[in-house]
């Protein structure tokens, strides 16, 4: 989202002209905690900023780890933002993290270490064919 559009949206939320919540990929649920309010589960600000926000967005396929972490992050941010800013409008439903096996920061840091790196011809089927390793052609 462009800076001016984000500023306009947040100004409308603050003035009461609009109701809503905003969250960005480089944010973390801890940023939505109010003094004395509930704590929200989620990834750390450092993990969100340093790895999740840097996952390439060049129409390349995501690895299973990238897809799982991005989905978890979206769910967790939406939960925190809407509980903080839209509590009256929410329909209560228990939070179910889509991929609970992908909540460990060390595991994520290892799996997403090169996720910001763009690969010539991508990581899709053509990349798999050109990659050295076991043949994908059946005997």
Residue ranges of each PLM-predicted region?
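Catalytic domains of lipid- and phosphate-ester/thioester hydrolases
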Residues: 1-139
């Amino acid at each position: 989202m462009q800076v001016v559009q984000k500023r306009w949206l947040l100004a409308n939320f603050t003035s009461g002209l609009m109701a809503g919540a905003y969250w960005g990929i480089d944010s973390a649920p801890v940023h939505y905690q109010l003094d004395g309010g509930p704590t929200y589960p989620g990834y750390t600000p450092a993990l969100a900023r340093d790895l999740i926000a840097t996952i390439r967005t060049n129409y390349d396929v995501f690895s299973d780890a990238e897809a799982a972490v991005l989905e978890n992050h979206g769910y967790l941010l939406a939960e925190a933002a809407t509980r903080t800013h839209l509590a009256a409008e929410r329909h209560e439903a228990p939070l179910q993290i889509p991929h609970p096996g992908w909540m460990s920061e060390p595991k994520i840091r290892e799996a997403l270490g090169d996720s910001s790196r763009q690969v010539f011809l991508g990581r899709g089927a053509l990349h798999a064919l050109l990659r050295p390793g076991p043949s994908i052609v059946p005997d």
